[in-house]
From Swiss-Prot:
Zn(2+) 2 binds at residues 804, 877, 884, 887. Keywords: DNA-directed RNA polymerase, Magnesium, Metal-binding, Nucleotidyltransferase, Transcription, Transferase, Zinc. Mg(2+) binds at residues 461, 463, 465. It comes from Rhodospirillum rubrum (strain ATCC 11170 / ATH 1.1.1 / DSM 467 / LMG 4362 / NCIMB 8255 / S1). GO terms for biological process: DNA-templated transcription. It is an enzyme of class 2 (transferase). The gene is rpoC. The keyword Iron does not apply. It comes from the Bacteria. Pfam families: RNA_pol_Rpb1_1, RNA_pol_Rpb1_2, RNA_pol_Rpb1_3, RNA_pol_Rpb1_4, RNA_pol_Rpb1_5. DNA-dependent RNA polymerase catalyzes the transcription of DNA into RNA using the four ribonucleoside triphosphates as substrates. This is DNA-directed RNA polymerase subunit beta'. InterPro entries: DNA-dir_RpoC_beta_prime, DNA-dir_RpoC_beta_prime_bact, RNA_pol_asu, RNA_pol_N, RNA_pol_Rpb1_1, RNA_pol_Rpb1_3, RNA_pol_Rpb1_3_sf, RNA_pol_Rpb1_4.
Length: 1393
């Protein structure tokens, strides 16, 4: 009885510990785990099938094979429990002890552990200061090593070959020095290490050393010595004397039919080790010659290596079928390893899968579950109910009833299923909406029915997709499924806070058709008194759905009082108005318009924000019913004739053809270069394609009274299916195609699919199609991998506290590009916390500090015309672990303040990773087929207003045209109140058509420029003189073969024999031949970069604003622009972009220094202080001229900057803004909306570490990477002891690196490089306190997020209670049942809202 009580008293296995520690096992430890030594390589006796004694499956060591039965059968049954049989030596107990009891092998010679030997950096090598190569030569018996030189001239750790060793013995005598070979020598060396003295010596050396390489090495060694001291491991434990043998049930031997056996590879590997070990023992007993013993020892070392990590050194040992054997390391590694296969992802019971079909008559919270499936899934519940209602007396009887499918079983199934939610999942589960809970409705048939509105979230369609069903069993699980995962509770997308339950396809089309209004329809001008009248009229066919009529509408006014208004509308819209909830924020005007997909989404959003969740769900369901009904009634379909080919198409194509011929002629005459011709041709055709498409849309969109609206147009315009781009290919012209390399083929496809393509056109178009398919396959895998890395880096970002109390934040501004505001300020600050009082121009506070900015606040901000707002950000949050609620702001999926315990890191990772599959894989050349229309060559005002110039540097030409001379000139348009409406970047060399203070109206041209060349322009009048422009060295006359026209082009001069010191430039002289100086006091000289085409002759007179040379754009721009997924990955991995830009670290003027062989020297000279020197590759196009003033962080040349540089020069906020901008650009191009805070969360995880620059009195070392929180804690500790604190700089790490450096070694090991992570953790004796999500999943606990966070808090509460009770009873010490006693701790009172 006592034993039974013990079973109840046990705390469940996973809850019984707080942390997991890993360290190196000492030989004593290994022996203490073991239940006996394994001496024989035999496994089981092939006749009796019983395990051999002392073999790998020995029952005496590992326990009985059958429950409570010894091997010889003398003792059977429970009553002999615990007795050890004297005949066969087997303990009578449960057979499952064979899963937990270990054995060991005593090795006849020590053997090095391959993980500590080979995994880089080699731990053994660092400790005894030998290279890996030397170590291996000693280990595998090639060389001797001097362990103790004595008084001989030999050096410590010197390598001696066999002959050298023999010679040394003869010369100095055998006892004068010690040299060893094999693992014994290394073990002796490790044993002689005194860690403490080594540490002090190294610290002294580190202080005195001057060489950088030496310092790095010392720091590495110091770290390892420190690790050993802290973990309490001894270095010689890295050399094994005993090997543990894992329990036999974990490496089973299963009999197959036909007398053969299937076995785990580990048994082979163990047998090898045992055989060699036994042979070695015998050889030593026999006193065999040294060389034989040595060979045997080497073989033993190799077999142990193979057991631990097969294939790490030398060739992998293969089994009978030439396949490498799976070693212990392989069991853990990779997708099929223990971590990812069995611990992070398990297969679950009570689940099924089937094809899905559409279920339009379901409610949003329902799904149709096939009866057969439901019966199987809910079997235990059905059995219990059958017994409860006395239909069956035993489970067996109940089982028989269910198998026969008796009628009462179905009734009971109905009852069991009522209000018991099930979870549906569609693979791939890319974000959390890929699993949602529904209430099952029993249906006939074998397919699961899915509600159409949740298809967007699941990314499901009904072309054969399958979904899996899971049943939450426990009450808690059902509760969570209902409250958190029910489809009705997931109306908003966690990525951007917009509704994700949106009508698509047919529903959109139906609503569009319903809300069309057309002239000349039947019943136009009628007036109706009520909705019922309208319905009668529609049924009697007196009036059409789309006629313009007047109707009386019952609605509410601004204050919510019921009123009756007369409205001009259509019968269709009136039908829709019946569904709209009554609310002041939802006037009739929201639906009294043509509803396209986006409009419907907006309506749903408004309903959700103002009327709450329940109303929204009902509204969506009814809208869906209405949409389907009318899509069916409308009978919209299309035929070939609906695709109207524009009559002007032939003319447009002919015109463009003529234009292209003219370009061809200009090229023949030598007026333009090959590259310019290509650009112009491509542009002309792009333009033509667009014109044809526009004409086609005009034709198709024509609405004539009495004729039905064009069906294709309706589908595309409503957003149901198809797009203008697809229609363009069907009825316009296909346009230009790209080659596989990404270049555009000059000849376009003039035909469309309706006319049909010619053979040549068809051939040209296959390129793109094939590339598309190849891309898609690659993309999916890459995107999945990106998501995995993101989840891994962010998994421990959890909301832990309400407010961290920081005053820091970041500045939010609207995103402006090409003059258009892409993301308004409101969009960026909505749902964030204000980091300071936001004031109007007159000083009234709009939003106080610490308040969350809601929708109505955003309206106030926009009215006040505020340009920038300081908001709290995850990046500046000062919570010690995790993130605080205030810095995060609104939970996007709920629209309310974020809850404590929300796993925001994983949500961020999913939100960024999920659209990954939509991003392109292509790396564009400037001008990938779809990527560019005509090059932009001018800017036009988008608003009326007044011009304000920034960085205005212009020069007036003789014709009084203003030419922009500044590299970063911007034109702003402001309204009367001086608020910025738009801003445009004006490139260098543009003609400025307006000026400071002028008024412009919308559509005015502000500036124009040549899009294909970058000009080099003079600022003064004078005579142009060539300098270092040497014919045949730095300048070549290039004659175009096709045209015979020649032009002077600057060529790559630094490879020429005479050209190394040249600096090709044009200088200006006045009439007296003296150099002209510019306004900034420097002489007027203009450097010519490679490929510049000279526009002036030597000695020619030039006026201000004249062009001296043109740099063709393709010359400076053939760099690929990395787009799409690769760009996102490059940013998150913090890689240096190829052809990266160098940025200035200080403000100052630019000067050119003396050049080196292949680099140009550029100096930035500040007002005061030392100039900073940069080396730029020669011939790269610089974005600046000599004498320009650059600001800190400005790029000095073309290209993307390196994120690390931005962090170093400009700080964390600038880096965050850069990352957000760049990543958002990629997603915006695909039309994907992601909230900034997700990118901020990932950026925070990338910025967790700091690099020590000055250790002060702390224990840190220079250059060490330390976690930010650890750094602060250590500094506070040092300050308390009146020491000097350490200094550090923030470090940016890529997501892979950051994941591998997390606090938790379990999480890192399950991500990548498992052996390396575990080796490192073992050496430093790390303990994992199970703070993140992954570690807890692996040990089988609730994750510390959401409801799990609450459980953790309760557990901590209970533990402190127990401790208090125990302390108070300390005197009499009554035994207290701890966590086993099931009591509900009182929850702390909820704070008053």
């Amino acid at each position: 009885m006592n034993e039974l009580m013990k079973i109840f008293g046990q705390v469940s296995g996973t809850q019984a510990f707080d942390q997991i520690k890993i360290s190196i096992a000492s030989p004593e430890k290994i022996r203490s785990w073991s239940f006996g030594e394994i001496k024989k390589p035999e496994t089981i006796n092939y006749r009796t099938f019983k395990p051999e004694r002392d073999g790998l499956f020995c029952a005496r060591i590992f326990g009985p094979i059958k429950d409570y039965e010894c091997l010889c059968g003398k003792y059977k049954r429970m009553k002999y429990r615990g007795i050890i049989c004297e005949k066969c030596g087997v303990e009578v107990t449960l057979s499952k002890v064979r899963r937990e009891r270990m054995g060991h092998i005593e090795l006849a010679a020590p053997v090095a552990h391959i993980w500590f030997m080979k995994s880089l950096p080699s731990r053994v090598g660092l400790l005894i200061d030998m290279t890996l190569k030397d170590l291996e030569r000693v280990l595998y018996f090639e060389n001797y090593v001097v362990v103790e030189p004595g008084l001989t001239p030999l050096k410590l750790h010197e390598m001696l070959s066999e002959e050298q060793y023999q010679r040394a013995v003869e010369e100095y005598g055998e006892d004068s020095f010690t040299a060893g070979i094999g693992a014994e020598a290394i073990r002796d060396m490790l044993m002689s290490i005194d860690l403490e003295t080594l540490k002090t010596d190294m610290k002294v050396e580190l202080r005195d050393t001057t060489s950088e390489a030496k310092r790095k090495k010392l720091v590495k060694r110091l770290k390892i010595v420190d690790a050993f001291i802290e973990s309490g491991c001894r270095p010689e434990w890295m050399i094994l004397e005993v090997i543990p043998v894992i329990p036999p049930e974990l490496r089973p031997l299963v009999p197959l039919d036909g007398g053969r056996f299937a076995t785990s590879d580990l048994n082979d590997l163990y047998r090898r080790v045992i055989n060699r070990n036994n042979r070695l023992k015998r050889l030593i007993e026999l006193r065999a010659p040294d060389i034989i013993i040595r060979n045997e020892k080497r073989m033993l070392q190799e077999s142990v290596d193979a057991l631990f990590d097969n294939g790490r050194r030398g060739r992998a040992i293969t089994g009978a079928n030439k396949r490498p054997l799976k070693s212990l390391s392989d069991m853990l590694k990779g997708k099929q390893g223990r971590f990812r296969q069995n611990l992070l992802g398990k297969r679950v019971d009570y689940s099924g899968r089937s094809v899905i079909v559409v279920g339009p008559e379901l409610k949003l919270h329902q799904c149709g579950l096939p009866k057969k499936m439901a019966l199987e899934l809910f079997k235990p519940f059905v059995y219990s109910k059958l017994e409860q209602y006395h239909y069956a007396t035993t489970i067996k009887a109940a089982k028989r009833m269910v198998e026969k499918e008796r009628p009462e079983v179905w009734d009971i199934l109905e009852e069991v299923i009522r209000e018991h939610p099930v979870m549906l999942n569609r693979a791939p589960t890319l974000h959390r909406l890929g699993i949602q809970a529904f209430e099952p409705v029993l249906i006939e048939g074998k397919a699961i029915q899915l509600h159409p509105l949740v298809c967007t979230a699941f990314n499901a369609d009904f072309d054969g997709d399958q979904m899996a069903v899971h049943v939450p069993l426990s009450l808690e699980a059902q509760l969570e499924a209902r409250v958190l995962m029910m489809s009705t509770n997931n109306i908003l997308s966690p990525a951007n806070g917009k509704p994700i339950i949106v009508p698509t396809q047919d529903i959109v089309l139906g609503l569009y058709y319903l809300t069309l209004d057309r002239e000349g329809e039947k019943g136009e001008g009628m007036a109706f008194a009520s909705l019922n009248e309208i319905e009668h009229a529609l049924q009697a066919r007196v009036v059409s759905l789309q006629a313009r009529v007047k109707a009386r509408l019952h609605t509410i006014d601004e204050n919510g009082a019921p009123v009756i208004r007369t409205v001009e509308t259509t019968p269709g819209r009136m039908l829709l108005s019946r569904l709209l909830p009554r609310h002041t924020a939802l006037p009739f005007s929201v639906i009294n318009r043509l509803l396209r997909k986006k409009d419907i989404t907006d309506v749903i959003d408004t309903v959700y924000r103002h009327c709450g969740q329940k109303e929204t769900v009902i509204f969506c369901d009814r809208v869906m019913q209405l949409g389907y009904a009318h899509a069916a009634r409308a009978g919209i379909s299309f035929g070939k004739d609906d695709l109207v080919i524009p009559p002007t198409k032939a003319q447009l194509v002919a015109d463009t053809d003529a234009e292209v011929k003219e370009f061809e002629q200009q090229y023949q005459d030598g007026l333009i270069t090959q590259g310019e011709k290509y650009n112009k041709v491509v542009d002309a055709w792009s333009h033509c394609t667009e014109r044809v498409a526009d004409e086609m849309m005009k034709e198709i969109a024509k609405i004539e009274p009495g004729k039905p609206v064009n069906s294709v147009y309706m589908m595309a315009h409503s957003g149901a299916r198809g797009s203008a781009a697809q229609m363009k290919q069907l009825a316009g012209m296909r346009g230009l195609m790209a080659k596989p390399s990404g270049e555009i083929i000059e000849t376009p496809i003039v035909s469309n699919f309706k006319e049909g393509l010619t053979v040549l056109e068809y051939f040209n178009s296959t390129h793109g199609a094939r590339k598309g398919l190849a891309d898609t396959a690659l993309k999916t895998a890459n995107s999945g991998y990106l998501t995995r890395r993101l989840v891994d880096v962010a998994q421990d970002a959890i909301i832990v506290i309400e407010d961290c109390g920081t005053s820091r934040g970041i500045t939010a501004m609207p995103v402006v590009e090409g003059g258009q505001i892409i993301a308004s300020l409101g969009e960026r600050v909505l749902g964030r916390t204000a980091a300071e009082d936001i004031k109007d121009t007159d000083g009234t506070i709009i939003v106080p500090l610490g308040k969350m900015i809601e929708e109505h606040d955003v309206e106030l901000l926009e009215e006040a015309g505020i340009e920038q707002v300081r908001i709290r950000s995850v990046l500046t949050c000062e919570a010690e672990t995790g993130i605080c609620g205030k810095c995060y702001g609104r939970d996007l999926a709920r629209g309310t303040k974020v809850n404590i315990g929300e796993a925001v890191g994983v949500i961020a990772a999913q939100s960024i990773g999920e659209p990954g599959t939509q991003l392109t894989m292509r790396t564009f050349h400037i001008g990938g087929a779809a990527q560019r229309g005509a090059e932009q060559s001018s800017v036009e005002a988008a608003f009326d207003g007044k011009i304000v110039m920034e960085n205005r540097a212009v020069v007036g030409t003789s014709e009084n045209v203003l030419i922009v001379m500044s590299r970063n000139c911007e034109v702003k348009i402001t309204d009367e109140a001086g608020r910025e409406k738009a801003r445009y970047r004006i490139p260098y060399g543009s003609k400025l058509l307006t000026d400071e203070g002028r008024m412009v109206t919308k559509g005015d041209r502000l500036a124009e420029w040549d899009p294909y060349t970058v000009p080099i322009i003079t600022e003064r009048e004078g005579i142009a003189i060539y300098n270092d422009l040497v014919e045949g060295v730095s300048v070549r006359e290039v004659t175009d073969e096709a045209t015979g026209i020649s032009s002077k082009v600057v060529v790559e001069w630094k490879n020429m024999p005479k050209g190394t010191d040249l600096k090709p430039r044009i200088t200006l002289r006045d009439d007296r031949g003296e150099g002209i100086t510019l306004a900034n006091g420097l002489e007027a000289r203009y450097f010519m970069s490679v490929d510049t085409i000279l526009s002036v002759e030597n000695g020619q007179r030039v006026k201000a604003g004249d062009v001296l040379g043109r740099i063709p754009r393709e010359g400076s721009k053939t760099r690929d622009i990395t787009g799409g997924l690769p760009r996102v990955a490059e940013l998150f991995e913090a890689r240096k972009p190829k052809d990266h830009a160098i940025i200035s670290e200080i403000d100052g003027r630019v000067e050119f220094g003396k050049d080196y062989k292949s680099k140009r020297r550029l100096l930035v000279v500040p007002e005061d202080g030392d100039p900073v020197e940069y080396l730029l590759p020669k011939g790269k196009h610089l974005t600046i001229q000599e004498g320009d003033y650059v600001r800190k962080g400005d790029p000095l040349m073309d290209g993307n900057p390196v994120p690390h540089d931005i962090l170093r020069v400009m700080g964390v906020e600038a880096l965050a803004n850069y990352l957000i901008k760049e990543i958002q650009d990629v997603y915006r191009l695909q039309g994907v909306k992601i909230n900034d805070k997700h990118i901020e969360v990932i950026s925070r995880q990338m910025l967790q570490k700091v690099e020590i620059t000055e250790p002060g009195d702390t224990t840190f070392l220079v250059g060490e990477l330390i976690d930010r929180t650890d750094f602060q804690i250590e500094n506070e500790k040092t300050l308390k002891e009146n020491g000097r604190p350490a200094n550090s700089i923030p470090v940016l790490q890529g997501i892979t690196k950051a994941s591998l450096q997390t606090h938790s070694f379990i999480s890192a090991a399950s991500f990548q490089e498992t052996t390396r992570v575990l080796t490192e953790a073992a050496v430093s004796g790390k303990s994992d306190s199970l703070m993140g999500l992954k570690e807890n999943v692996i040990v089988g606990r609730l994750i510390p997020a959401g409801t799990g966070a609450m459980m953790n808090r309760l557990r901590a509460l209970a533990a402190t209670r127990d401790k208090e009770i125990e302390d108070s009873r300390g005197a009499e010490m009554v035994p207290v049942l701890g966590a086993a006693e099931s009591f509900t701790p009182r929850l702390p009172e909820p704070p008053a809202e």
